[in-house]
Structures are given as C-alpha cells and as structure tokens.
C-alpha cells in the first residue's frame, strides 16, 4: 500500500502525532478493505478447527509475540488459544540475542516438538518482514503436523531477500497469507533530517487482523448453532467465576493456563 507522505493540510504541516494517527487509519483501512476475504477464510478455518475439537496455536518472534498475548487468556478472547511463548525469541531475556535467534535455522523443530499440534488445529504465525528462518520454519513444522497455517506479514518485504536457506518468504509456506499492509521499516513518521522514522504500525495492524479473524470465527460458530467459548473480564462482577469453569475445561490441553 502506498501511504500518503504529503502531510500538509490547510496550509500547515501536521504534527508528528497527527501524521501517525492518519497513517494508522490508512493502514487499517487498507487492511480491512483489501484483506476482508482472507480474514473471512481464516475465520472459517478457525471455526472448522474448533468444531473438530482443535485449538488455535499462535506464534511470533520479537514484538510479534505480542499477538500471541493479545489472543490468549484475556477478556473477550477465545478459550481455545494456545500461545507459543518461546522465551529465547522474546525481548526480556536479551533483545539483541532474540534477533540473532530469529535468524537461526534448525531451532524451530525443537520448539514444535514440545507442542501437540495436529491436523485439527490452526497455527497463526506473525512476522511483518516474513524473511527470517525461525518463523518460516515454525510454519513449515506446523504444516508437517497437518495444521492449517495462517500467516500475517507485509507484502512490502516480498521484494526483499529472505534469510531462510531456501530463499522462502513466510507467505510461501502458509495455507493462507494475510498482508498487514505495513511499509518496509515499520515506522512511518520522519523525525530526523537523515530520514529516520519513528511510529511503528505493525503491532496495531497485526492485532487488528488477529482479532478480526477471531470475530469472524465467533460469527461462524454462532451461525452454526455453537456458542463460542470466550473469557470474561475478571474485573467485572461474576467474571472470575465464569472464567474458572473455562480454565478447568482447557487447562489440561493448554499448559500455560
């Protein structure tokens, strides 16, 4: 998507925050307009998985791991979500180290061996660049186990060289690839004279896509006569009690509950 960089409106230059807000709206509008059919297909796949007793596994490296947290154990979130929190690829145990590990080949299979993902499950993998070995090989490992693989990445990186040994990009190995319409480099507001930008948009875009997939699945479940199992807010009256029943049902299948 071509994001408009002419931020002069009404004879004055828009502030950085106004530029950012406009760019966020532009990205989300592009996503919801262009990717609607794919989001609907992802929702259908997820609905089918749940009807067969499957789970939604979610994975991302670095900041993309936040999408796993976004969908897991939260008010309004589906119960049948199994996040893959691989701490070596998260920032709290060494940010620079996580970047190096994300580019490693051969580690993904060791991670996937710890999870009982199978043919009734869906696997949502998020990587805006979609060029690093770990994420691509996680998607491949999930496919080998029979899961339906949904990828979220940016089409802006398809022209960039992949770091994966076979030159693959994330969309190449997914059953369904959804474009988050994030520009290469992620940040969108120029803040330095040399062209350096701030204000990343990938987390907002990818979370919006992920929650849209969830809502699509909920709608399809409801239409088929099955009420989706959704967590309640523990900060509202009665929420804890309702959630206790959900946890009791799923904690044997989802270790991190």
Language model segments and positions:
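Glycine-rich phosphate-binding loops that contact phosphosugars or nucleotide phosphates
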Residues: 57-214
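YjeF_N-associated NAD(P)HX repair module
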Residues: 192-257
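Generic N-terminal amphipathic, Lys/Arg-enriched alpha-helix
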Residues: 13-34
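A short, well-structured juxtamembrane/interface segment
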Residues: 34-49, 111
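Short, Lys/Arg-enriched N-terminal segments with co-localized hydrophobic residues
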Residues: 1-13
């Amino acid at each position: 998507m071509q994001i408009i960089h002419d931020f002069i409106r009404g004879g004055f230059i828009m502030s950085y925050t106004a530029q950012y807000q406009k760019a966020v709206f532009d990205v989300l509008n592009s996503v919801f307009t262009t990717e609607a059919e794919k989001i609907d297909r992802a929702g259908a796949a997820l609905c089918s998985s749940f009807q067969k007793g499957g789970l939604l596994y979610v994975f991302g490296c670095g900041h993309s791991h936040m999408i796993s947290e976004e969908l897991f154990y939260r008010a309004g979130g589906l119960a049948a979500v199994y996040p893959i929190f691989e701490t070596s690829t998260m920032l709290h145990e060494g940010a620079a180290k996580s970047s190096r590990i994300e580019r490693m080949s051969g580690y993904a299979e060791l991670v996937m061996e710890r999870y009982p993902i199978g043919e009734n499950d869906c696997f949502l993998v998020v990587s805006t660049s979609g060029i690093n070995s770990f994420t691509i090989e996680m998607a491949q490992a999930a496919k080998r186990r029979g899961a339906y693989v949904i990828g979220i990445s940016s089409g802006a990186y398809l022209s960039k060289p992949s770091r994966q040994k076979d030159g693959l990009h994330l969309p190449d190995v997914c059953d369904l690839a959804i474009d988050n319409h994030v520009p290469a480099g992620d940040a969108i507001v120029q803040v330095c004279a040399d062209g350096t930008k701030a204000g990343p948009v990938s987390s907002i875009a990818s979370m919006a896509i992920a929650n849209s997939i969830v809502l699509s699945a909920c709608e399809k479940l409801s239409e088929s006569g099955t009420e989706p199992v959704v967590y309640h807010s523990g900060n509202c009256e009665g929420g804890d009690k309702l959630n206790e029943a959900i946890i009791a049902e799923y904690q044997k299948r989802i270790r991190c509950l």
